[in-house]
């Protein structure tokens, strides 16, 4: 029974060989497998570490190259993109404003002459005039007119008032006096009738009607003169 319990399907059991060496062989196989796996893991780790280190080493170089490329590119520099603003001195500004009040548009020779006088370039003078014209148009309200237009309109508004106050006497050509004394009254009466007819037939709005002898009443220096109807002709 003891021999039957030791029987198995292994080669050693069939050949009746001792089974003591079976465990050391398994240990040797395990030992041989462990170094192989360890070597494989070390190789993989070294590969990944070398790739990471190489990436870390090359990243500063890449960043420096990118920085140099950005510096060399013309559109990346903010100082180059931003236009340099021209600062005018007080004397230059006063002269430009004085010339702008005289003349808002300059020709090319005038622009060059003014730029030479102020030690500027013609382009700077041209841009200053353009900006000043734009500011003037933008700051002007729609209802505000030019100073010349305002003066002309004030003169037009003031003209009717002056016409109302100033009365110009109309001189009527008198006929030569006759030798008869009767001609004195007959020559003056038709004149008064004509003046009265003109005053009533042609009324002017805003003007007051004056009588035949009231025109001289506006001028104190001529009040001592009598109306034409009262003058007697002595020949």
UniProtKB/Swiss-Prot annotation:
PROSITE patterns: HOMEOBOX_1, HOMEOBOX_2. It is found in: Nucleus. GO terms for cellular component: nucleus. Gene3D superfamilies: Homeodomain-like. Coiled coil: none annotated. Prominent expression in ventral brain and neural tube structures. It comes from the Eukaryota. The keyword Hydrolase does not apply. Residues 51-67 have a biased composition (Polar residues). Pfam families: Homeodomain. Residues 51-86 are annotated as: Disordered. GO terms for biological process: axonogenesis; epithelial cell proliferation; lung development; negative regulation of epithelial cell proliferation; respiratory tube development; transcription by RNA polymerase II. Residues 69-80 have a biased composition (Basic and acidic residues). SUPFAM superfamilies: Homeodomain-like. InterPro entries: HD, HD_metazoa, Homeobox_CS, Homeobox_NK-like, Homeodomain-like_sf. Residues 81-140 bind DNA. The keyword Nucleus applies. Its main location: nucleus. One of its GO terms (molecular function) is RNA polymerase II cis-regulatory region sequence-specific DNA binding. Keywords: Developmental protein, DNA-binding, Homeobox, Nucleus. Possible role in the specification of a distinct subset of neurons. Belongs to the NK-2 homeobox family. This is Homeobox protein Nkx-2.8. It comes from Mus musculus. The gene is Nkx2-8.
């Amino acid at each position: 029974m003891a021999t039957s319990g030791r029987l198995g399907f292994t080669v050693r059991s069939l050949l009746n060989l001792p089974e003591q060496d079976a465990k050391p062989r398994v240990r040797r196989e395990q030992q041989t497998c462990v170094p192989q796996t360890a070597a494989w893991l070390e190789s993989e780790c070294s590969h990944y570490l070398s790739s990471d280190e190489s990436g870390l080493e090359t990243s500063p170089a890449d960043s420096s190259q990118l920085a140099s490329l950005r510096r060399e590119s013309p559109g990346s520099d903010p100082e180059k993109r931003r236009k340099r603003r021209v600062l005018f001195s007080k004397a230059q500004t006063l002269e430009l404003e004085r010339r702008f009040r005289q003349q808002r548009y300059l020709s090319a020779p005038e622009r060059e002459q003014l730029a030479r006088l102020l030690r500027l370039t013609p382009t700077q003078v041209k841009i200053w005039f353009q900006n000043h014209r734009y500011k003037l148009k933008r700051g002007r309200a729609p209802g505000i007119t030019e100073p010349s237009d305002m003066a002309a309109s004030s003169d037009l508004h003031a003209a009717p008032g002056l016409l109302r106050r100033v009365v110009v006497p109309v001189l009527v050509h008198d006929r030569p006096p006759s030798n008869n004394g009767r001609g004195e009254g007959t020559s003056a009466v038709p004149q008064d009738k004509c003046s009265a007819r003109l005053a009533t037939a042609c009324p002017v709005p805003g003007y007051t009607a004056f009588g035949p002898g009231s025109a001289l009443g506006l001028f104190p220096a001529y009040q001592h003169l009598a109306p034409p109807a009262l003058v007697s002709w002595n020949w």
